Amino acid sequence: MSRFGLFLCKKHGKYNKLRRSVSKYSLWRRATAVMMVLALTAGLTACSGNGKTDGTQSADEVQLYAWPLGSSSPEDTVTQIYAEKFADEVDRLSDGKMKINVYPNSVLGGDRELLESCKDGDIPFVVQNTAPQVTFMKDTAVFDMPALFDNIDEVREHVDNPKFMKLMQQVYNDAGYELLGYADQGFRVMTTNKKIESLADFKGQKIRTMENSYHMAYWKALGASPTPMTFSEVYIGLQQGTIDAQENPYEVIVSNKLYEQQDYVVETNHLPHLISLIVSDEFMQGLSDEQQQIIREAAETAKQYAREQSDERIASKIKTIEDSGTQIITLSDEVHEQIRKECQPIYESIEKNVSSDIVDAYLTQ
């Protein structure tokens, strides 16, 4: 039996019921982002006469320029809350000697550009969803296994498992980053104009997804027709009937008013929407031990704060949706179990592409 199958069997007490189942990077955009960062910091950097010849900076020195943190997300999101809390904590813990400026809305580049620039140390800090990272770090696909968890607290317990975090930190280190933690925006859910209460109801639904093979495989397994589409086109796509449905966390659904074009929100809870905070490993190694400790401590505080904010905001977003007249559908345990059975080939595919140690650690509480 696959690790995923065994996990689900143990989790749901069904040992006898589950069968064995086993473009080239855009250089000009990156250059533009780097030039923007240099322009933002050059004046202040020039005023600093305390540079170390060994490339490190003493914690006692006053930082005369702010390190940039890039994000592709809008301001009114948990991603921004996570980033700003981290920057505030770094400032507080260093008594104002260490400064970070947050640049949301893809000001410094999209997800791919941010990852490239972070690796090189041009944009030392990045906060982003884990989905775009699969191209750079294939083991992050472990987060793409669908329909495993009943609630977000359970997800957090598995993500925070020390053994799992140690393995994932090595994955990021090998790619040129240091992983500082994972916050989240709860689960991803589906919106549609069709009342969906059974597995058969998903059939034929043309649903917008991210361009991620595992995400698309999930919807195909349910009988839907996944359609990758640029996010900026989703609202008008729903409005014009180009697509029937879409999937996102509650935060995105409300901030972009997608519920205005849909009659139902279906709590598929198929994937947790995890948000990573990463730093360039090269940049981090150039800091003093004290500065590194400040950054790690600030990241832990920011993670916990972002999770608390996420829980509060989701409750508020649900109320906004319900007040608009859009109905929220909670699927039965039976339907969730049927979905898990349909996902067995996806679990098998992920097992083939992700380190078995990482899979085992993620499935262990």
Where does each model-flagged region fall?
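Short, low-complexity disordered leader/linker segments with a strong preference
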Residues: M1-A66
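Short, flexible, basic/aromatic active-site loop/helix in glycosyltransferases
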Residues: Q169
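Short beta-strand-centered segments that line the small-molecule binding cleft or hinge
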Residues: E157
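N-terminal secretory/targeting leader peptides
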Residues: S48-D153, K163, Y172-Q365
